[in-house]
Amino acid sequence: MLLLVSGGLGLLVEQAAGVRLAGVLVVPVGLAALVAIAQLTTYWGATARLTTPLVVLAALAGFAAGWRRLRGAGVDVPPTLAAVAVFAVLGAPVVLSGHATFAGYTVLGDTAIQFLAIDRLLEHGRDLAGLPPSSYQAALRSYIDSGYPMGSQVALGAVRPLSGQDVAWVYQPYLAFLVANLALALYAITTRLIARRWQRAAVAFLAAQPALVVGYALQGSIKELATAWVVALLVALVGPLFAARQPVRAVVPLAVAGAAGIAAIGPAVLPWLAPIALVGLVGTIRERISWRDVVSRAGVFAGVVAVLSIPTFAALRSYAKVTQHVITSGSELGNLLGPLNPLQAAGIWLSGDYRLVPATTIAGLDARALTWVLVGVALASATIGLAWALSRRAWLLLVYVGISLLACVYVMRIGSPWADGKALMIVSPAAALVALVGPVALVGTRTLETRVGAGVLGLAIAAGILGSTALAYHDVSLAPRDRLAELGRIGAREAGQGPALYTEFEEFGKHFLRAVDPTGVSEAFSPDVAAAARPGGNGVRFGYPVDLDDLNLGYVERFRTLVLRRSPVASRPPVNFRRVYVGRWYEVWRRDDAVSRPLAHLPLGRGLLPAERPRCADVAALARQAPRGAQLAAPERPAPPRFLPTKARRIPGGWHVDGGEPLALDVSGQGELLGTLTIPSAGRYTLWLGGSFARPVTVALDGRRVARFGDELSGRGEFAAAPGSLTLRAGRHAVRIFRGGGSLAPGNGNGASRRLGPLILGPAGSAQPRVVSVPVGAWRSLCSRSLDWVETLRR
């Protein structure tokens, strides 16, 4: 549907311009129109809901107006296959995973914000009135009030209803579509330089996927990908303006693309847009077009851009105020692990994570050394490509490379490392394109030796680019579809039962639970988080789950619904909450207003010990403070048997204790852990394994395989339960945890968030601990029991 809508809008823009667009640019121009229109209509609440029908009707009008062209036009096979191939490459990690999901999970939390914006803006525009305090509301307010660019997001939102899917499951195909349109624009830029269409298509296919573009695509960076595509499109569109016989309105496609760039990334696009517009103006003047036509064209361009960019201009002051520090601070890294190497712009980076220096071996060769060799080859080839373009007066390629480099240098002089990374990514298709032009220049020579050398040069650059893509595919972090889908079902099931609290660190919780006014207590967007932490507890840390025992009782009681990640070591909610749902990964508890709220709460247990025997002095103090006739309630639960991977007999090389989770190991490559655990009493147990798993991890007890985990990336401190239950005897049991070797499956490499945590044996099934209730006067009876907590209740 996105292709059809973009195609129809491209034909409509063509009609408005009164010129015939190059066939390969119809869809990219239509996509630009979709971005600009959706940004405009979603600015106001009154027009937001009309966005989808409006763009569909406009696309239909475009097909009707351009019907004659469509009837006489065939499919231009080479660029079409190049774009389809790029789409397939960028979509491969999701498609070959077998699940509709998205990439960049645990790598870039901003994707959750994009999901929120897409849903909210298409229904209510930028109006947040009526939203109660929650992480959902706080995140939206923070971004919308700051003038955050939303054009590329709402373009997806405009067509999402046509798919009937949650935005999370169509997000990655949209990013792949953006890069496919980049390939079409690159094909157009080299039209006059590379005569053979199949050569041109091969060059566009490779140049559209330099390592940084792939890396940003596989972390969900929607604005940056849109900018890379728009910059190439602007250059491709500026060439036809030089013709003297073009009507004044011929600038409309360029203006629409310019407005799309502003909608996609805001005023930050000006280092690219302004020079391109200046080139168009100078080129028009050089063609001896009358000054009246020059002024008229400039006026039409400025007018179209101004109207379509009203939302951006209206929020300009807020945007400048909020982004000044983020863009220019020398210490702002965003999600980077350090400043990127400028040579990464060459398009080759043999690391599964573009943020890391290549550190593996490839076919027995050192990846870092091989990277530098291939980067050097690409740079040498780029000089050949530039020289050939100059000799052939291929001005579009020279303009594209020159402006991209100048804009990148400008951003890197004033920008933060975070902004520098974006600029390097945006320039990388231009760098890769001119490097790939080098072999094409040489292959046209007369000598056989030079043609053979051209082939070797082209293969080396192609191998570097495709090798970088393959490594990124192997280390991609895919979101756990089934778990997040369960969270979405809970959000729909509990709609209207808010406010809700979730204690897991799950940045996508605020999207999937949006109908229940969710608050993630350890989120970056957590209202009144200062009131959450219990004095003397472990506190609330961003990026980590929080146990209910570490929260103030009054804070927890604010919420009607609790959405809790299932865990063998998590505390039971207060006694006035009852469980209303149990799934594979989550439980839902609802406050029962028919039960009196606890007057006081004595937390017990810590870390992997969810319960302990209370000190009699503490129970006595609780009893003394209780009103006459009160009750003491306490869940009984034993300490669960456990095996700590950090205490294994031997830890494999490449595995080490996680810096932020001292009871877990960061794992890389194949390995096994051996040890023992002791079970105090025979019975049926559920096996839980902490960690975040990409490739399969198996668990064996006494030489028998009992569980397998895989495709379950997760945040810190969380557990996954093995299906079914185990019947085990009392005593010592041998434990073996094995992580196998890699495969060709996406995400099967050693990317981010691969951890192995404690093995816990919990009670079989989903039964909750029995809550013991005794009169205050019988408080001593609780001192000898293993308890989760003790609460005081009015009778």
PLM regions and their residue ranges:
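Transmembrane-helix motifs of polytopic, lipid-linked glycan transferases
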Residues: 7-12, 59-69, 173-195, 381-384
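Active-site lumenal/periplasmic loops and adjacent helix-entry segments of GT-C-fold
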Residues: 90-230
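Hydrophobic/aromatic-rich transmembrane helices and adjacent perimembrane loops
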Residues: 176, 224, 230, 271-275, ...
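Transmembrane alpha-helical segments
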Residues: 264-269, 312-315, 413, 438-441, ...
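Short periplasmic/luminal acceptor-recognition loop of GT-C membrane glycosyltransferases, typified by
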Residues: 462-468, 474-537, 559-567, 589
